Amino acid sequence: MMVTAVKKAFLCVALSVCLAGAARAADFYQVRGGIPNSQYFLKANVVGNQYLFFIGDSVLNGAGLKDSNLRYSNQMVQALQKHFPDANMHETRHMQPGGSWFGLYRVSHGQAVFGEVIASGHLAILDFAADDRDVPIETVKTSLEGLVRQIVLYRATHSQILVYTLTPEMLAAYQAGKTPEYIRVSEQIAEHYGIPSLNLAQYAAEKIIAGQISFPAISADGINPTDAGAKIYGEAVAKFVDALVGANPTPDKPVKRTLPAPLFAETNDNGRIVAYEDVAVKRSGNWKPGQASPIGPFRHVLISNEAGATLTMKFKGSEIGLIDVVDKDSAEYQYAIDGAAFQKLAAPKAVAGPTMRPVSLAKGLDRKAEHELVLKVASPGVARVGGFLLNGVVEDPTAKLSTLERIDATYAAMDPIVYQPPAGRFVNIPHTMAKLRDGGELRMVLLGDSIMGNTSGSSFELLMMRDYPKCKIIKIASLRSSTGCKYYRLENRVQDYVLKYNPDLLVIGGISNGGDAEAVRSVVQQVRAGKPDTEVLLLTPVFGSPHDEHIRTYTREIDTTTSNFRFNLQKVAAEEKCAFFDMTGPWWAYIQNSGKTYGWFMGDAVHANARGCQIIGHLLEMWFKE
């Protein structure tokens, strides 16, 4: 009996020790509300490519690694892939300086200069520990919280994860038995918003403190991990992801989040980059918009080499700053807020080459009051402006315009397109043209990828209905990211993506057909087999990367001497009795003749912005117009 009691007591103690050890092993991460919405999207797998956005600093770049695949961001994607093997995940890393302060502006509503909403998709992983080392903790509080709130405001179904990597300051705190102040504040924010967090700093520090490895072995420079350090991070990532995915069942549909009140009263969640071409920015003097930037992520910059050239902007907000490109030839600026004395923003003296410079000009402003910034070139040299960093709002004179009025305003600010469509182009779409001319309802299905999303976003059907007022066009965008006819032709997908919409006219386009005109033919034939009276219009590619074939090997007219997608698609159109529009030719000719860099028309590295969409929209209007 005594032995049994002792055994029981021993087992209880052992179990307690094991549980305590498990608790200690797990306290380097917190699951909180988890990422159930991302689990839904990863499992549903209906959007094509799924981009996981890692936003942070040099650690994401893999600096210091011999094997770049060991970076923790890649290991996190691979760990998620094990749970969702069919999801086409892409690790998308955004490494820029400025820590969470600049992150507040980067993770905004989409900027014409930066070109993309870098927290799009459904999951943002935020890692600013290294760049926030020297930032006052009060700034971190409001910047990180504002950033977290903006992501939810942008997309209420978005999931987030906070990650903390090891720094010398954090290690010193852990060695002293303390929680680093940065992590304490970040965890306050994570707890307030129910965001999962992964404390790689603690996981690595515990191994150093236990004597299992030295800090130099983990990181040669104190910030960026070595291969050995990255493997330790990878251990933690694997445990975290397993716990994260296992904590919540995958929901039947994503749930929109409602933001609580800010944790810190000073937090402002209106961070944005006001691009220099915004109507709120007034120019005087000699400025050249739409010029090529010597560095990314700018798509284009505003350039002046005239001392005295001035930019003025009225705004409401708590902080205003500047983002520009500086180099050895840069001019200095002077700036004034609300009529105060001008202050100097010096030209940099120690840059090795073109460098992005985000800088605050004034903070702590009355966010409800109207302010005015005046910025002027104040010395010989070159000014290369991207935009203004504003935690606040500017007046949008287009906000009350209708969609048609807005696209008219966009196009009015562009050089007009000169294009003469070919005769005989309507021969294979007689019923479509009859409905346009004579009236009735025209059901038009757009099939393709996100470039066809740009096509839909141009609202070209409104331009067409203005030309053909008797006809009501029902436009249906049936799209999947990075997806073309090589996908749609399989497994009877034409039923779900085309036939169920009962189209009168099917429009196939985009840049994701993989150069395979025969895949397009297969889709056309399957659609006609299911609904023989469907008319079809085939479009050649527009937009995309400069490395894509239709740009890299561009000719104004289709090259009929070699096998290329434009030529092959033209042959498919003729043989399958489809209408055909070689949009590539006039689209790229317009951009080449515009006097602007390609980025002037880009919304990101691949897609069109509002100007680019109106090239598409007005070309389609011209093609359909008799």
Residue ranges and their predicted role:
Residues 127-131, 148-184, 510-511, 528-566:
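Active-site segments of SGNH/GDSL-like serine hydrolases
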Residues 1-55, 59-67, 78-89, 118-119, ...:
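N-terminal secretory targeting modules
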Residues 55-57, 94-98, 126-131, 164-168, ...:
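Active-site-proximal beta-strand/loop segments in catalytic clefts of secreted hydrolases
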Residues 139-146, 179-183, 517-523, 565:
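Charged helix-capping and loop-helix junction motifs
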Residues 48-51, 86-90, 119-124, 156-161, ...:
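Loop/turn elements at helix/coil->beta-strand transitions in domains of secreted/extracellular proteins
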Residues 54-55, 61, 103-141, 437, ...:
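Oxyanion-hole/transition-state-stabilizing segment in secreted/luminal serine hydrolases
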Residues 28, 170-274, 544-626:
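Catalytic His-Asp segment of secreted/periplasmic serine-dependent ester chemistry enzymes
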Residues 86-101, 470-485:
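A short beta-strand-loop structural module common to alpha/beta enzyme folds
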